[in-house]
Regions:
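N-terminal, positively charged/glycine-rich alpha-helical extensions of SAM-dependent methyltransferases
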Residues: 1-14
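Short, high-confidence coil segments that cap the C-terminus of an alpha-helix
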Residues: 41-43, 109
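Conserved beta-strand elements of the Class I
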Residues: 45-47
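Signature of N6-adenine DNA methyltransferases within the class I
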Residues: 13, 17-18, 22-33, 50-67, ...
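Glycine-rich helix-loop-beta junction characteristic of Rossmann-like nucleotide cofactor-binding loops
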Residues: 35-41
Length: 260
């Protein structure tokens, strides 16, 4: 099993930046995976839209062995390592060399977990992707939209009833102009449950210092408040589940900054 640390030591930073490969620390992967399975006993079909080396699959398999995982990635280098790492699990883990945003929309999943690529609008062919998302979801995303939010919106649309989603992404969309439409969709879909803002100053994402947020969503059509937590020390990440401020959906305005 080649770990993210070993891979990063062998594969140059230029290559990893080209494919926006900033790997999730395992304790964060475990935390996100716990959300996927919490009160979701029938969860058996899971999607990893940005598979990488499979840190989420490792966390998943620690919790449930009878599972079906579908993964996507476009980088031959990381795919070769990932497929070797999970060669003995090929019956339950399917990893495709394909662009998730080009995959079929009608596939549905009980759990979706992801650390998507972080690419600015000028670093990828955003026009085609944005048109597809707008067409499928009825959104009005603009040309400055970061690719990680496209992953997020498509994934929400692919949840089964009762399905759960955990994403870790930059928090910039909470305050940016392009994020207004993203937040509007999150509110209108009724799936957003919890936003955990985490200061990663002391826990770099593999050479990428960032303030990120973890999003928990569920498709359950229930009336609920939306929780917000801010974590300054990643060692206290689990405290976000009990230490939060909650708002009714009607109290949140997509056009207002959500992070102070």
């Amino acid at each position: 099993m080649i770990t993210e640390k070993e891979y990063s030591a062998k594969v140059g930073l230029e290559h990893r930046k080209k494919y926006a490969q900033f790997f999730t620390p395992e304790f964060i992967s475990d935390f996100m995976t716990d959300w996927i399975f919490h009160e979701n006993p029938t969860c058996c079909k899971i999607l990893e839209p940005a598979f990488g080396l499979g840190v989420f699959s490792r966390s998943i398999l620690k919790r449930k062995s009878q599972i079906c995982i579908t993964g996507y990635d476009i980088d031959d280098t990381v795919l070769g390592v990932a497929k070797a790492n999970f060669a003995s699990k090929s019956d339950i883990i399917s990893i495709a060399k394909a662009d998730y945003l080009e995959s079929k929309w009608d596939a549905k999943y009980d759990g979706i977990i992801c650390n998507p690529p972080y690419l600015k609008y000028h670093d990828y062919d955003n026009g085609r992707y944005i048109s597809q998302i707008n067409s499928h979801l009825g959104t009005n995303l603009n040309g400055f939209t970061n690719i990680y939010t496209l992953f997020l919106l498509k994934s929400i649309a692919q949840l089964n009833e009762g399905g759960r989603l955990a994403y870790i992404i930059p928090s910039e969309f909470l305050n940016s102009d392009y994020g207004i439409e993203v937040k509007r969709f999150l509110l209108q879909s009724g799936t957003l449950k919890h936003i955990i803002i985490v200061d990663f100053t002391e826990c770099a994402f593999d050479d990428a210092l960032t303030t990120a947020c973890i999003l928990f969503c569920q498709k359950d059509n229930s009336e609920h408040d939306i929780r917000f937590s801010v974590i300054k020390d990643v060692s206290t990440l689990s405290s976000a589940l009990t230490n939060y401020v909650s708002y009714e959906i009607s109290e949140l305005d997509a056009e207002i900054k959500w992070r102070q």
